[in-house]
Each structure stands twice: as structure tokens, then as C-alpha cells.
Amino acid sequence: MIRTEEMLLNVGPQHPSTHGVFRLVIKIDGEIIKEATPVIGYLHRGTEKIAESLQYTQIIPYTDRMDYLSAMTNNYVICHAVETMMGLEIPERAEYLRVLAMELGRIASHLVWWGTNLLDIGAVSPFLYAFREREMIINLLNELCGARLTFNYMRVGGVKWDAPDGWIEKVEEFVPYMREQLAGYHDLVSGNEIFLNRVKGVGIYSAEEAISYSLSGANLRCTGVNWDLRKDEPYSIYDRFDFDIPVGSVGDAWDRYVCRMQEIEESLKIVEQAVQQFPKDGAVLAKVPKIIKAPKGEAFVRIESPRGEIGCYIASDGKKEPYRLKFRRPSFYNLQILPKLLKGENIANLITILGGVDIVLGEVDG
């Protein structure tokens, strides 16, 4: 009688497919995964505790380093929470600059996901194309705020700098270019038979399971749940734009792929409309005191980041530092379903499933 033994295998903590320091301990029988245990904490820096000894403006650079692929949305959520507590009215021009920065960041984030996810499953050229377009976005954001990755651009009451001369025109020119490249991406990958065999029917979960695991973003919408905070609980000026929310039906890796690719197109729609509506002049920062003190009380706000629903809770005792600050980090919640998805799967599908969930370890660990 042939007897097999299970093997314990460590994937990471330094593995090219994890895009951060993340360890996955898997128990395999032959090529079938019997059990998977994520080991996290390698990037934990105690952001929330550090924030209790910082002024509100000083916290903003720390948010850059959570989801470092989408720093603008992290900047926004902390500012939005403080502004909600203070009852601030944000200047029109600042609101449009915020939306442009966040949506360009969303496109750049999805481009990183597209390129690296395909690289991990064996397609090299999409990675090069994705980073070519991402570099254009990074250059635009660099012109806007002087940084390429950790922007520190948002401020309580608006933004730090106005757009330089000619910047809006450059953004306007980028939209049709990106649409053309996106069509090329679909020609190259989306109909590729080998790619479809790798993603269709892989990593399936239901809408009920997605909700019970507190999934959000494309990881929720791929199951058919039409939920996006930009539409369902509009913040900033998102209610002024006409755009759709892509949803899937099966909840597999293919649906997650389609949702994110369609989100790039919808973000381009928002950018296009924001450029057309952009105010010709006006302030970019509300009148706020140099040292910001949130009034006594508490507030919780949530917004839609590329990875899902990011939230910020602040409890204030009226001082210049928060009494307590808590972030709801979507990557942390989205990661929780990974052991369920991997159990019983072939080890060859591990990277496909992990890449489809799209976690950023700086955000997971906090």
C-alpha cells in the first residue's frame, strides 16, 4: 500500500509573489494544499499608537506608508475624519485636486496589480507595459506634489499645493492615451486562452461569504454585490460625476480581474469629468489654525480605496493629538479569506489566488 506524507512548506517571508514581507505556511499532500496559515506582522510599525503622540498634520506622512501603492486615498481618509469633526468646508478647487489625485492613484495602483499579477503567473511583457503607463501617472503626481510614492499632499482643509501651470492639460492628454493602452491590454491578455485557463473557476467564493469575511472593493464586487462608497455613500464631490460600478457574478479570479480592469476605465471617466469641471481659480486650503485641535468627541469616516473600504476612527479630547486613532485597513480584512480559498487547491493556483486578492503588506500590518 502506498503511503503519502504531508509536507510543511514556507512561502516567504521574502518571496517575489508576495510584494512585501509576508509568510504563508502551507501544508501540502503531493500538489494539493491541505491547510494555509498566513503569518503577518513583519511590517508592523505601530502607526496607530505613534499617532497618539503626533499632531494631526504630522500623522499624514504615516498614512502614506500603509498602502504605499495608493497613498493619496490614505492621506484623504485621515484629513476627512478631522474635517468631519471640525465641520470644515473644503474649497472647490481643493476638492477637484483631491479627486484627480486619488483617481490617478487608483489607476496607478491597478496598473501595478495588473503587471505584477501577470508576471507572477508567467507573463513578462504586461509587467513592462503596466509600469510604462504607471510612470506617466507618477510623473504627473510628482509635478503636483513633489513626490513619487509617499506624497504627503493632503492637508486638513484642502491640499498643500495648487496644480502647476499646464498640469490639468497634461492630465487631459493622458486620458485618451490610457484608454488606447487599456484596449491593448485586453487584446494582449484578457482573451488569451492560457491566461483564461489560469483564472476562470479559480478561487471562487459567494457573496454571502464575502460579506461574512468583511471583504470590500473588487473582492466584494466580484461576487455580484454592487457596493462602492463613491456611489453608495458619496464623499468629497463624487456625486457630481457620472460613472458605473463594475460587478462580477461568479466570484472567481477572472471576475476580480475584470472588475479591476473596468475600474481603470471608470476612473478615467471621473478624471475626464473632473478636468472639464475644474474651477479656473480659487483657494486650495480652507482657513484653519496653524495647530489643529479637533473638538472633543469622536468620528468615523470611510472611503473607497483601490483595495476596498478604508476607514478612520478618531476619538478626541480636544487636544492637538488624537486620544485614540484607528484605521480600518481593507487589505487586512481581505486577507482573512485566503486560507479558505487555498484549502483543497492545487499549489500551482496559490499565486493566482494570492495575486487576485491584491493585498499590500504595509496596510495589512499597520
From Swiss-Prot:
**GO cellular component terms?**
plasma membrane
Subcellular location(s) of the protein: Cell membrane
| Membrane topology, from the record | Peripheral membrane protein
Question: Which GO terms fall under molecular function for this chain's record?
Answer: NAD binding; NADH:ubiquinone reductase (non-electrogenic) activity; quinone binding
Which keywords belong to this entry? Cell membrane, Membrane, NAD, Quinone, Translocase, Transport
Reaction(s) catalysed by this chain, per the record, are: a quinone + NADH + 5 H(+)(in) = a quinol + NAD(+) + 4 H(+)(out)
The reply to whether Ribonucleoprotein figures as a keyword in the UniProt entry is: no
| Main location group | membrane
Top-rank taxon, per record: Bacteria
Tell me the Pfam families matching this sequence.
Complex1_49kDa
The enzyme's E.C. designation:
7.1.1.-
Give yes or no: UniProt keyword Cell membrane. yes
PANTHER family to which the protein is assigned, alphabetical: NADH DEHYDROGENASE [UBIQUINONE] IRON-SULFUR PROTEIN 2, MITOCHONDRIAL (PTHR11993:SF10), NADH-UBIQUINONE OXIDOREDUCTASE 49 KDA SUBUNIT (PTHR11993)
Name the HAMAP family for this protein.
NDH1_NuoD
Family, similarity comment: Belongs to the complex I 49 kDa subunit family.
Assembly and oligomerization: NDH-1 is composed of 14 different subunits. Subunits NuoB, C, D, E, F, and G constitute the peripheral sector of the complex.
Q: What is the recorded function of this protein according to its Swiss-Prot or TrEMBL entry?
A: NDH-1 shuttles electrons from NADH, via FMN and iron-sulfur (Fe-S) centers, to quinones in the respiratory chain. The immediate electron acceptor for the enzyme in this species is believed to be a menaquinone. Couples the redox reaction to proton translocation (for every two electrons transferred, four hydrogen ions are translocated across the cytoplasmic membrane), and thus conserves the redox energy in a proton gradient.
Q: What is this protein called?
A: NADH-quinone oxidoreductase subunit D
